[in-house]
From Swiss-Prot:
Lineage: Bacteria, Pseudomonadati, Pseudomonadota, Gammaproteobacteria, Enterobacterales
Gene3D superfamilies named among the record's database cross-references: Diaminopimelate Epimerase, Chain A, domain 1 (3.10.310.10)
Listed GO MF terms: isomerase activity
InterPro entries for the chain: OMA_tautomer-like (IPR047687), PrpF-like (IPR007400)
Natural source organism: Escherichia coli (strain K12)
Enzyme Commission number(s) of this protein: 5.-.-.-
Keywords, alphabetical: Isomerase
Entry protein name: Putative isomerase YbhH
Protein's UniProt keywords contain Disulfide bond: no
Stated family: Belongs to the PrpF family.
Amino acid sequence: MKKIPCVMMRGGTSRGAFLLAEHLPEDQTQRDKILMAIMGSGNDLEIDGIGGGNPLTSKVAIISRSSDPRADVDYLFAQVIVHEQRVDTTPNCGNMLSGVGAFAIENGLIAATSPVTRVRIRNVNTGTFIEADVQTPNGVVEYEGSARIDGVPGTAAPVALTFLNAAGTKTGKVFPTDNQIDYFDDVPVTCIDMAMPVVIIPAEYLGKTGYELPAELDADKALLARIESIRLQAGKAMGLGDVSNMVIPKPVLISPAQKGGAINVRYFMPHSCHRALAITGAIAISSSCALEGTVTRQIVPSVGYGNINIEHPSGALDVHLSNEGQDATTLRASVIRTTRKIFSGEVYLP
């Protein structure tokens, strides 16, 4: 049987396989077949692979040394679909980004400095650039630490991620429809593309409080059908075309915060509710809190830049927004995440 080197890592509130691009075929079709075999795609439990039967654990990060002078490494994210044999490389994944720097250092793609190594990452999916500050005392990656993130038990070393050019990652525009508010099925929404194209929907317009647990929302098939109808219309309006076989745009239900944050959210991936919150989605949501005229601003009257706390089913996530320019195209977003190396070895291919 053929085998390739593989590292399994938790990145933020996601988990997946980290692979070097040199160990995979350049042909996309052949590459995707290998990724599906590794994860066990096409089975609800992903029983024949290392995927966990959930979108949050059926992810792959493909890493290589970058040819772009603005980056040290290239990172291609692959969402391996659980229930069908398909791979989507359209979006970025900010949680998996948390492990890219450590993986790159430990695989010799960039030399470590002490006490912190800044790894410049180019996300191949979106063309965006991210800086990851990895704890490397004495030139060695440190995984243990005191940082805690909601949705993950225990503590670990902090990884600071700064998104340098998040505006219009897939569509070229912050507001791809040229409107701050659009109406689909008579529901007001905001379509925004900051790190991730999302369609933001006030929960009350779908007959929900927005505080329901993910399992309750996932069981409501009528709700999921309404969300998908809005998502498909939003995708076309955002210039993404027919998104029925794409995981973007991601739908987000919003409601007033309950625990002192700026906003409460339920983030969909896109057909099931995230147990916490995607980093890229959090950047889009926080941007909608700061920018005028959005449906979010009808709930959050005034936030501005700085730290924006977003409540989600597992707790909350802080995004720090800064802007040295005059409009949203120059927004920078920073988050603190953690990562853990779970195993390093070889994965066998059927």
